[in-house]
Amino acid sequence: GIFAGSGVGKSTLLGMLARGSEADRIVIGLVGERGREVKEFLINCLGEAGFARSVVVVATSDRPAAQRVCAAWTATAIAEAYRDDGHNVLLLLDSVTRFAFAQRELGLAAGEPPTTRGYPPSVFNMLPRLVERSGRTSKGSITAFYTVLVEGDDHNEPVADTLRGLLDGHIMLSRALAEESHWPPIDVLQSLSRLQPHLVSQEVGQSVVAARQHLSEYRRHADLIAIGAYRNGSDPRVDAAIAMREPLRNFLVQDARQVADLSASQSELIRLVRTPAGT
């Protein structure tokens, strides 16, 4: 799941994923987006190369709630059909929150009782049914990214909270990083992957842990560092975190038009955390 407030860059990140994907097929579901945003995504974010190898299902915000709900199921069904044909599929659904909004409209209109923040029970029944349809079978696979629009940057609102328990990975986009022109604005410390130990080597896993420790140490002492109250040499861990700050930031920043090689990125991360003072 890609969790983000409005205007933080989730559409740009989806376009980067689509253009850089090595999947056999790409299926994109755009649910509840404005018509202008759909056009901008297809032209600017997805691009000609990405669009040429993608199936796009769209139900804009002005369409009836039933049609918006149907768009999410349709995109998922198309991905399943490709998977059953033996393909590895990338499914991008933007956004599962607006799918939940549409189902809320239908549920309330049907007379369901509102529960948490006005959501009827059918919303929380449909969310697991939707996301559980992705994954690997004996024939192929569906790797799915679901964007979650966090209302008011509240990551504990009901839809986001439910999806955190359903999804294997959480990519948290930070408004503060976006304001610093840190693109993509992924908050590494808030993000996690439950499957990471099964997907990367032990060496890469240890490098990830080391990098996160440096970032965490710097964040804990950021106020002291900013006002000049921290004295170099007071704590070796903080000294290392300060030295690694810029190298790690440069590693995490990526131009939207750039496609990074996974093996090269892993090797670069290993080199960074092994090099004294990040030099």
Describe the residue ranges of each PLM region:
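P-loop NTPase catalytic core
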Residues: 1-279
